[in-house]
Amino acid sequence: MSINATLLGQAISFLLFVWFCMKFVWPPLMNAIEERQKKIADGLADAGRAAKDLELAQVKATEQLKDAKATANEIIEQANKRKAQIVDEAKVEADTERAKIIAQGHAEIENERNRVKEDLRKQVAILAIAGAEKILERSIDEAAHSDIVNKLVAEL
């Protein structure tokens, strides 16, 4: 193989091509590659942070859900206690009202019985006087008559 001018020209052309590529083509390519690597690294870092944030959010959501359930159970328990209290108060009030109505009924019955007794005494006194008048055929004067009636009413 002989070295001739063509080979020397090709070598010089190749060196100029390499120098041109190193000067003008290689730096933008390297910048693009480095920029792409940086974007990928940033994306991976963001993904890692997002995964941690998601995990923290899930833990926080779970805690809030537990707190909400506990609060709901507490509210339900308080409502049940209040319901029982209202029912007990209603029972006490109903018993009080029942006792009041019964006492009022007994008082009314007693009053009616006393009134009926008094009416009956008066009627018996009137009948007794009428019977006595028929027997005595009006031999007793009016003053004695009133005195006898009053005594009969007092006895009855």
From Swiss-Prot:
Gene: atpF
Family listed: Belongs to the ATPase B chain family.
Transmembrane segments: 7-29
Organism name: Shewanella pealeana (strain ATCC 700345 / ANG-SQ1)
Coiled-coil regions listed in the entry: none
Domain of life from the UniProt record: Bacteria
Official protein name in the record: ATP synthase subunit b
Keywords per UniProt: ATP synthesis, Cell inner membrane, Cell membrane, CF(0), Hydrogen ion transport, Ion transport, Membrane, Transmembrane, Transmembrane helix, Transport
Predominant place of localization: membrane
Compartment(s) of residence: Cell inner membrane
Keyword match Cell inner membrane: yes
Membrane topology (UniProt): Single-pass membrane protein
Cellular compartments per GO CC: plasma membrane; proton-transporting ATP synthase complex
Function: F(1)F(0) ATP synthase produces ATP from ADP in the presence of a proton or sodium gradient. F-type ATPases consist of two structural domains, F(1) containing the extramembraneous catalytic core and F(0) containing the membrane proton channel, linked together by a central stalk and a peripheral stalk. During catalysis, ATP synthesis in the catalytic domain of F(1) is coupled via a rotary mechanism of the central stalk subunits to proton translocation.
Subunit structure: F-type ATPases have 2 components, F(1) - the catalytic core - and F(0) - the membrane proton channel. F(1) has five subunits: alpha(3), beta(3), gamma(1), delta(1), epsilon(1). F(0) has three main subunits: a(1), b(2) and c(10-14). The alpha and beta chains form an alternating ring which encloses part of the gamma chain. F(1) is attached to F(0) by a central stalk formed by the gamma and epsilon chains, while a peripheral stalk is formed by the delta and b chains.
Protein's UniProt keywords contain Protein transport: no
GO molecular function: proton-transporting ATP synthase activity, rotational mechanism; proton-transporting ATPase activity, rotational mechanism
